[in-house]
Amino acid sequence: MVKGRSNKTLAENRKARHDYFVEEAYEAGIELVGTEVKSIREGKANLKDSYAEIRNGEVFLRNMHVSPYEQGNIFNKDPLRDRKLLLHKMQILKLTAYTTQQGYTLIPLSLYLKNGRVKVNLAVAKGKKNYDKRQDLIEKAAKRDIERELKDRSRY
C-alpha cells in the first residue's frame, strides 16, 4: 500500500490573518515528546494565542495547547509547555533580524502532517490596528456585493 503524501491540516490559527499582516511564512519541524503526536493527530491541538520566540539562537513555540492523550496516563506532558521548532541556522538568523524590528512577531498559522511528521507553518507578522481590521471588513463586504451582482446578472 502506498502512503499518502498529502499535507493534512491538523490545527489552524484562524484569527491570525484577521489580527496580523502576514509578511513571510516558513515551514518548521516541531520537537514533540511522549504522546503529544498521538494527541495532535486526533486534532486536539489549539494554536489560538500562541506565538514563537527566539532564545539563545533557538526558536520556541509558546502557549500552544496540546490536550493530554486519553490513553497516555503517566506519559502525558504539560499541555502548555514550550516546544522547540526545528529550523535551519540561516532561517533563524533571518527571523531574528525580523523580530528585532519594532512591531514584528512570529505566529503559527497552521499545524499539519507532511510525510508522517508534524510541521508548523510559522509566519513573520505585524499586528493590525483596529482601523485596519475595519477596512478589511469593508473590503470583504464590497467584494461580496460585487460577486452577488455578477451572479445575479449572469442568471438573466
Curated annotation (Swiss-Prot):
Q: Which UniProt keywords apply?
A: Cytoplasm, RNA-binding
Q: According to its record, what are the GO cellular component terms? A: cytosol
What is the purpose of this protein? Answer: Required for rescue of stalled ribosomes mediated by trans-translation. Binds to transfer-messenger RNA (tmRNA), required for stable association of tmRNA with ribosomes. tmRNA and SmpB together mimic tRNA shape, replacing the anticodon stem-loop with SmpB. tmRNA is encoded by the ssrA gene; the 2 termini fold to resemble tRNA(Ala) and it encodes a 'tag peptide', a short internal open reading frame. During trans-translation Ala-aminoacylated tmRNA acts like a tRNA, entering the A-site of stalled ribosomes, displacing the stalled mRNA.
Kindly provide the name given to this protein in its UniProt entry: SsrA-binding protein
Could you tell me which InterPro entries the record lists for this protein? SmpB, SsrA-bd_prot, SsrA-bd_prot_CS
| Example GO biological process | trans-translation
**Tagged with keyword RNA-binding:** yes
Q: Which organism is it from?
A: Clostridium tetani (strain Massachusetts / E88)
Q: State whether keyword Amino-acid biosynthesis applies.
A: no
Major subcellular location class: cytoplasm
Upper taxonomic lineage: Bacteria, Bacillati, Bacillota, Clostridia, Eubacteriales
Coiled-coil regions, chain positions: none
List, alphabetically, the Gene3D superfamilies matched. 2.40.280.10
Read off the HAMAP family from this record. Answer: SmpB (MF_00023)
User: Would you identify the family this protein belongs to, as annotated?
Assistant: Belongs to the SmpB family.
What does the UniProt entry say about where the protein is found? Cytoplasm
One example of the protein's molecular function in GO is: RNA binding
